[in-house]
Amino acid sequence: MNDIEIADLYQELIVDHSRRPRNYRRLENATRQAEGFNPLCGDKVKVYVDLENDVVRDISFEGEGCAISKASASLMTETIKGKSKAEVEQLFSRFRHLATGTGDGSGLGKLAVFSVLRGFPARVKCATLVWHTLHAALEQTANIVSTE
């Protein structure tokens, strides 16, 4: 896929997932949760995870934010359902490297469209906030995560 095709797909996915986010709800039976905040953009997100035997049975999110953060959260929740904790951590690492320009989109599926953010550090924080929040929820390392 060339850069123009990726940019077109990015636009389409961001608009779709920000207007109609998937898994945007409070997960009542969550076994893990964490909150994230991006002071630069004002994004706030809460991630809920139902983790059983180290497998993500269900995941959801709530929050306010820009189109990029909401779309990233929506796409992330679709991508990681049914994945093991180890697989999720690998996806998080790949996504972070993709968004910051140190990796490619292999193995990321639709998430690869976020490669267009490489030249925009503030937007990278919008896209990765939910991933850092998920990591904190899975590892139970912090209740509130900040991009700063």
Enumerate the language-model features and the residues they cover:
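C-terminal binding/interaction regions
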Residues: 1-25, 83-148
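Alpha-helical support elements that line or immediately flank enzyme active sites
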Residues: 72-84
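Contiguous, function-dense segments enriched for cysteine-driven chemistry
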Residues: 39-50, 55, 67, 97-98, ...
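Short, thiol/selenol-centered motifs that function as redox-active sites or metal-ligating centers
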Residues: 63-71
